Amino acid sequence: MIWEPVLAKFKELFGDEGEIGVYFAPGRVNMIGEHTDYNGGHEFPCALTIGTYGVARKRDDKKLRFYSMNFENLGVLESSVEGLKPEKEADWTNYPKGVMWAFGEKGMKVESGMDLVLFGNIPNGSGLSSSASVEVLTGFILRDMFGFDVTNQDLALIGQYSENKFNGVNCGIMDQFAIAMGKAGHAIFLDTATLKYEYAPIKLENAKIVISCSNKKRGLGDSKYNERRSECETALAELQKVVKINALGDLTEAQFEQYQDAITSPVCRKRAKHAVYENQRTIKAVEALQNNDVALFGKLMNDSHVSLRDDYEVTGIELDTLVEEAWKIDGVIGSRMTGAGFGGCTVSIVKDDAVDAFIEKVGTAYKNKISYAADFYVVEIGDGPVKLA
């Protein structure tokens, strides 16, 4: 079992007495519907069978002792449940501490500390939501440990709240929602404006989902993410002078074409066009899957990437290379960047008999062009957070 070394590390660092729990929260990938979550549109993410493992034990004092097997050079990072605030030297522990703080803000005070060891098999900085996975995992552990009366959907909202207010990153709800609400074999058709959702089975006969990781490091906080949000807000404010909408996601393509001249900046107009068209693509993509039309789903994935490249301008040479090389290969049904962009990953649907050639050819072309290697993961769609032991 993947978690056994994590439990062994916990016992080595913190001893084996008391009630020790073993937990898992997945990572996520978004199949289509990118940069729509803060524009009141739809998304189509799913939880993965890779994610974050946590071993935790409640303490009878206020002390927090955190250790990550992914950042062993940092050693055990100690703090307290009293006076929680973000600190640069706290590094990755700002994510679990932020969730503890957020529980307190929502009227559920974490009264005692804990010992925690984490191990993630999500590639770090890949855009598969390692931070949101840690947030949902922390919330799930706190619920189990302290008996807080919260649903999995609440855990998603608390995770997002902590990332926004404690860590100062303007993320939407998708990452935490997909992780907290994951269901094996299904993606989540999520209306980000209302949080209404439905599960849609992903039936890929003779095909696999392949994640290609660019290995270009990026952080949400220092990317152009916030800039894109404000460009969309500017476009929305100008559109609202001529048409009654709450969000860009309220518009159809035809309505956008009718009213787009209200947006004075050509750049903001392009950003808004992506938000509107991507939302409509996502709705069509889910319909395509329901009709078992995987080929149409793949075409919409490809169109999504073109829009993210040309109208939203969040791809960059690394992601474009991965996708454009994928498009050349027989047996690739669809390929696009996924996540915030500027590095991170692509998601591709690849026929079973083409997977090996895909990894070899895309990998070689990428290394030749970018000068360092990409990593490839053939992934399965998994469930949300779980207590393993």
Locate the predicted segments by residue.
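Gly/Ser-rich oxyanion-binding loop with an adjacent helix/lid
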Residues: M1-Y23, V29-G33, N39-H42, N73, ...
